[in-house]
Structures are given as structure tokens and as C-alpha cells.
Amino acid sequence: MSARGKRIIRLLSLFWIPLTWILLTGCVGQFETKPALTATCNIPWHLAAGFPERDAPPPTQNQDLHVLIWNIHDRVLPGSMFASDAHTEEEVVCIGDLASRYDLVLFQEAFVRPAPLARYTGHMWANHPVFTEGGGGDWWPLRWMCEICLSPGLLMMAREAPTWVYAEPYQAFAGWNTDENKADDFFSKGFQLVQFPRFWVLNSHMDAGRGQDSIDARLLQFQQITAGLKRLVPSDAPLLIGMDANLRPEIEAQDQKILEEFLQSNGLTLIHQNGPDIIAARHLHTDHPRTLSLKGVLSDHHALSVFISQPPAPN
């Protein structure tokens, strides 16, 4: 390359890197730096969810645990380039008000406010993994420009402390967004696996597109979960799985096959499904699975809930 060509490339890089940084931080923002949520929730979410009172659902009364699974779509902060897609602080407080009523919470797309949201709900324990490698959001210069792009957006909160916590980035993802193959912009993907004293819990969020690249990526992601479960979790251990699987088995035969193979390979029973969101379990008694109709109220997804009975304590 000539000296003139090299100078042109250097000049372009001087403009391209700052421009890319501005676009990325403007599009997806950064983690919320405000330490606490101070707004008040005045949105009547409890009516949309089917609860007659704002303080519902009632706290758990016996040994059962009440579990909430929800893609909360908290992806950008107000003031970013795509702020029309951003939650207000009041909406996040409403999400926290609902989550605070549950013993165990599995959130997806908790990208920008995981820490203040976890503090707000008052759960004893919370975990929000961030990957340093893998998952799709770790390439340079993205990792330098966008701190939340290394996050899979998974937030788990519980009233009891776990005995072991693990997270693993996915090796497969659909890549750049197109009309049919979506990797949720630049964010990473992976799963969160937690061992509590009497049972295990897995939380995840899979690729979102409808195209073949996304279908293939989801297949490999589910296979990676299966490999992780067989490697890390005893086959007779009680296990709860809650996730935004981004499967639509009712309209896509390949998705149906992926789901069936995943359930069969891991000895799981599908407890509840609404759209792309699922609850599955093995060696656990579950009761009253339901959908909370919060899509269009506090998120672009409905929430799922279920009661699980505490298994006997291991000897």
C-alpha cells in the first residue's frame, strides 16, 4: 500500500473509532451509575397482571417458593439515542415492586440497572454475570466502547444464599442483526447456573431471530446448556429452568424439535410456556404456573410465575 493510502486509512480510523463509540454508547448506553432507585410506582400494573390489590401476590406462607421469570426489556437508559425504547425509572421501580414479592426471581434483559434493581427488591442475594470473553459481545473495539455489551442481561435474586454460582457464555450466536437473524444487537449471550442448598436453577436468554442462522444458533446454545448440565449437575438433582428461549414451536417445526430434544436429553418436564418464555423442571413439585399479562405495560414480554415445593434437605 502506498504512503498516501496508509495516511487515508489512519485519517479514517481517527474519525471511525470515535463515531462508532458515540453510536454504540448512544444506542445501548452504559450501566446505570445512580446507586438507588428513588421514583415511586403509580402505574396500575397489578390490574394488568390480574391481581386485585397492589401488594399482591401475597408473600409465600409455607415451604413453597414463589418464582418469577421475566424478560424485563431494560436495555437502554433514558437520554440515549434510542431513548423511546428505554424504561423510565418509575417503570423499573414497578418491576422491582413486583419482584420484591417473590422468593426467587429470574430476569432476562436486565442490562442497564441490575445493581440498583437488586438493591431495591431487598433480596438476600443477587447475581448479574458479566463475561470477559465469549458470548458475542467481546470483540474489539466493542468491548472497549460498550461495558454492558459483555453482559448477557441475566439477573437472579433470591431470599436464600446459594452454595455455588456459575455462568457460561455461548459459543454460537447469529451475529449481526438482519431482518430475520437477530442477536439482540451487540449484547452477549449465555446461561446462569446456580446451586441452592436443596435445588439448582438455570436462567438464560437465547438468540431471537426467525431466520435459519438464528435457529441454528439456538440449537447449538441448547446443546451447550445440555453439555453444561451433564457436566455440572447430578442427574438426580432437583432442577428449575426459566428462560426466554425465543422458541416458537407452535409455528416453527425446527423450534419444536429443539425444545423436545432439550427436554428429553435432560429429563425435564415443560411446566409452562407463553410465547418465547418457558418454565421447565425435573425432580421438583410445581404448582399454579401462570402468565402475568404485563406485555405492553412494563415490558415487551409477559411474565411467568410458579410455585415450587422445597425438596427434602440432602443428608
Regions found by a protein language model. Give the residues of each.
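N-terminal secretory signal peptides that target proteins for export/translocation
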Residues: M1-I8
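C-terminal motif of bacterial Sec signal peptides marking the signal peptidase cleavage site
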Residues: T25-G26
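Metal-dependent phosphoester-hydrolase catalytic domains
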Residues: G29-D55, L229-L240, N246-N315
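Structured beta-strand-rich core segments of catalytic domains in phosphoester-bond hydrolases
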Residues: P35-P59, L104-R198, H288, L292-K295
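Active-site beta-strand/loop signature of hydrolases that rely on acidic residues for catalysis
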Residues: H66-I72, I95-L117, M157, V194, ...
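Acidic/histidine-rich helix-loop elements
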Residues: I69-E90, W176-D184, D207-A217
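Extracytoplasmic/secreted proteins, especially bacterial periplasmic and envelope-associated proteins
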Residues: E90, C94-D97, P152, A217-L220, ...
